[in-house]
């Protein structure tokens, strides 16, 4: 088992305090958006052997170049040395010689871009196409960073606000009807975009209704930006919003962050969700979503393939986006945990690359078997735990994380003797076995 040093991504939307607070360490002073725990080649964790751990004590943060000495090695390089040992034969057969999942701590202070992730076939084909065309992998117009899909899930540690998947067209139409009534009541001229959207959304075929409304908005242009500004001006000056307060206050917030961006009104086509701490949602390919605010544990297939659909100053490839969006109204894909032995919770989304175990250990509690098929990763967000495998022990304090090779299973997670507080940890492994 290897303790890990992980890379912090300082995206501008990140909270400056939430990740440091969760992990019990000093804040960097800048935004701390995502902590990546895994072997994605863009930001691999560093695996520390006992010697490397001593050398690193007191240091922290990201390391671009990792020397292959002193007991420190990038996790992807470690796995490359013996994939079957670290990942297990079954995982290598299913996903190839790479860690199939990525665990993140995500802290959104302001909204992330509206986005969609591709299916496995779309990712493979898109990556091959851009490679063949010689598009630089770091180019702004590059869509596919790797050849893999990126289904994901988010577990809320704090109240967590998000947009997730299309609502039924009739529900979105009702919001635009309310806005039309607000303009009439105030004697304001209705932007022509609104009656056009009402017509789009009235189509009896729900797929067509969502598709035409989405296409009209994502096309952008002055019609969209002027209508957005007029709607926000009406809302700010007190237009009635009931019963769509949450949706319409989100419109105002998004417009302030990204004035006139197509994503501002696209938000009204999507489910507006508020997760309570302990709740989780999963996001399959084709689901249009955006995280708005909150701290969570995010797990995904190890990929960085994102097609953006707005709420971003970054490149938006509309034709490619339209190929990947699923224009179907969906119920919010909430993920209920299975309660396993000793009261532990296991979140199993319908993807084979990952499952998430929430491990709670009160002082003196019985040890908990780690759910593990193939490799696993664990992060301690409260208290301390002792990992006990047939090959040895590893104690992890508050904020520490570790990589657990397949060959070192089974692992039991113990409360640390003498601990006074409850320990809380999150562990990820593949979902190859039932
Ligand atoms: Zn996403």
Located regions from the model:
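A short beta-loop-beta micro-motif enriched in histidine and acidic residues
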Residues: 30-32, 98-99, 109, 148-150, ...
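Short acidic-glycine-tyrosine-enriched beta hairpin
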Residues: 272-282, 287-290, 359, 389-410
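Short, conserved beta-strand element in jelly-roll/cupin
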Residues: 37-39, 105-109, 116, 151-159, ...
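Conserved short histidine dyad/triad with adjacent acidic residue
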Residues: 340-343, 352-372, 398, 406-407
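C-terminal, non-catalytic macromolecule-binding modules
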Residues: 294-346
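Ligand-binding loop in jelly-roll beta-barrel domains
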Residues: 106-111, 118-120, 148-152, 158-162, ...
């Amino acid at each position: 088992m290897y303790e890990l040093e992980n890379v912090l991504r300082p995206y501008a939307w990140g909270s400056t305090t939430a990740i440091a607070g969760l992990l019990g360490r000093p804040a960097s002073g800048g935004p701390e958006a995502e902590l990546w725990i895994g072997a994605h080649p863009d930001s691999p964790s560093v695996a520390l052997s006992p010697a490397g751990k001593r050398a690193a004590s007191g240091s922290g943060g990201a390391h671009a170049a990792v020397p292959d000495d002193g007991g420190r090695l990038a996790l992807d390089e470690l796995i490359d040395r013996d994939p079957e040992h670290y990942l297990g034969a079954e995982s290598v057969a299913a996903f190839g010689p790479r860690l199939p999942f990525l665990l993140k701590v995500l802290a959104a202070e302001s909204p992330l871009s509206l986005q969609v992730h591709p299916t496995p076939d779309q990712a493979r084909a898109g990556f091959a196409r851009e490679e063949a065309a010689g598009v630089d992998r770091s180019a702004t117009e590059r869509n596919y960073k790797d050849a893999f899909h990126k289904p994901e899930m988010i577990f809320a540690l704090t109240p967590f606000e998000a947009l997730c998947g299309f609502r039924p067209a009739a529900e979105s139409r009702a919001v635009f009807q309310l806005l039309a009534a607000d303009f009439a009541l105030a004697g304001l001229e209705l932007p022509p975009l609104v009656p056009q959207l009402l017509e789009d959304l009235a189509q009896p075929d729900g797929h067509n209704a969502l598709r035409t409304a989405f296409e009209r908005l994502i096309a952008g242009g002055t019609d969209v930006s002027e209508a957005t500004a007029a709607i926000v001006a009406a809302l700010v000056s007190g237009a009635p919003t009931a019963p769509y307060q949450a949706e319409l206050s989100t419109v105002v917030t998004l417009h302030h962050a990204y004035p006139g961006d197509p994503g501002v009104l696209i938000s009204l086509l999507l489910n507006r969700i508020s997760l309570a701490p302990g709740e989780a949602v999963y996001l399959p390919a084709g689901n249009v979503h955006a995280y708005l605010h909150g701290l969570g544990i995010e797990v995904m297939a190890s990929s960085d393939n994102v097609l953006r659909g707005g709420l971003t100053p970054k490149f938006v490839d509309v034709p490619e986006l339209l190929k990947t969006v699923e224009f179907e109204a969906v119920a919010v894909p909430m993920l209920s945990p299975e309660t396993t032995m000793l009261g532990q919770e296991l979140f199993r989304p319908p993807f084979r690359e990952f499952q998430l175990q929430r491990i709670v250990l009160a002082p003196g509690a019985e040890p908990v078997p780690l759910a593990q098929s193939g490799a696993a990763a664990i992060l301690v967000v409260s208290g301390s735990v002792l990992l006990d495998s047939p090959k040895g022990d590893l104690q992890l304090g508050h904020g520490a994380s570790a990589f657990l090779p397949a060959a070192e299973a089974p692992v039991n997670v113990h409360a640390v003797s003498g601990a006074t507080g409850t320990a809380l940890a999150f562990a990820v492994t593949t979902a190859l076995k039932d």
